[in-house]
Design a protein with these regions (language model features):
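Hydrophobic alpha-helical transmembrane segments
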Residues: 1-53, 95-207
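Glycine-rich active-site/cofactor-binding loop and its immediate structural neighborhood
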Residues: 47-76, 80-81
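Basic, amphipathic juxtamembrane/active-site segments
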Residues: 67-109
Length: 207
């Protein structure tokens, strides 16, 4: 999915020659924060689900374009990479926290999801620090953004719907978070296993 978005947005790079990649990173961050705020406001009006989905799309576009523009115009830098990764984590937390406080949602599920998402991202960074190459194994941010955008449409129409499980009521957002928790947990295990195997192979090759 990541490669698909790189191919999709690469034609825009020549038009953005005068835009610094860090500006696109900041744009992605601001759009992500606004997405989280929008999801948190869905208790006031379900329309904010659709607004949040729009901001998620804009955030994802900015996140793809900053690296594309940097590579296309020779503006890659350690500073840009650092800012990009930090902004990515802030966007993750903002969007997931907004979902946790969305209409009818259980905040505890959102907290679990944030922890899993940060651990998943940390593993990729740690593999890069240990082996010198970034791991994008498992579910990535591109897939997460697509899932969020797809979620917002039924969430708007099903904002008053609940699933009763015993004495508990689960909103549509809860079911979405449960699916994300399961998917992220599976991806986390896969990334850990592949990273560990890569480290063990590297250790064997050094002997």
């Amino acid at each position: 999915m990541r490669n698909f978005f790189i191919a999709l947005f690469s034609p825009l790079a020549p038009r953005l020659r005068r835009v610094h990649p860090n500006v696109l990173t900041l744009f992605s961050l601001l759009a992500g924060i606004l997405a989280g705020i929008s999801f948190a406001l869905t208790g006031l009006a379900p329309l904010f689900f659709l607004v949040g989905g729009g901001f998620v799309a804009l955030s994802g576009m900015g996140d793809s374009l900053d690296g594309i523009v940097a590579r296309a115009h020779g503006r890659t830098s350690r500073t840009g990479d650092f800012l990009d990764h930090f902004a990515d984590r802030l966007v993750d937390v903002a969007i997931l926290a907004g979902l946790a406080f969305s209409r009818g949602a259980h905040a505890a599920l959102g907290f679990i999801l944030i922890v899993l998402a940060l651990l998943h991202s940390y593993l990729g960074t740690q593999i890069e620090a240990t082996l010198g190459r970034r791991s994008y194994a498992g579910t990535g941010k591109a897939e997460l953004f697509v899932a969020f955008i797809a979620f917002t449409i039924p969430a708007y129409f099903l904002s008053a719907w609940y699933l009763r499980v015993g004495q508990h009521r689960l909103a549509f957002a809860d079911l979405f978070m449960l699916a994300l928790v399961l998917g992220t947990a599976i991806s986390l295990v896969q990334r850990f296993r592949r990273g560990l195997q890569a480290c063990m192979r590297a250790d064997g090759g050094d002997r």
